[in-house]
Amino acid sequence: MIIYEDAVIDYLDDLVYELYKKEYFGFLESAYNFADNIIDFIENSIDTFTSKKTPESLQHFGSKYIFYKSNQRTTWYIFFENFENKYLITNIINSHCEEAKYL
């Protein structure tokens, strides 16, 4: 079971509109597909992809993380908590964020 904190869902929704508004994608549907690819990666990989322990300075994001490389310039870091087969997605940042330099 995978659960997303409300803030993560809000972030992904905002991301779609920001990518479209800044013309990274010419169509809103393309921006939605981009966000869907991140979600698909989480849904299909979180239980098989080797997770890493989050550095102490970023523990407020979540105790573990996995990463998804969406293209040559951008890597997405997905933070979470888990117990057995239950996962709580607590935060998502990308390699362009200041905090990513600590990963």
Predicted regions and their residues:
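Basic, Lys/Arg-enriched alpha-helical interface segments
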Residues: 1-65
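Enriched for short, Lys/Arg-rich terminal
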Residues: 68-103
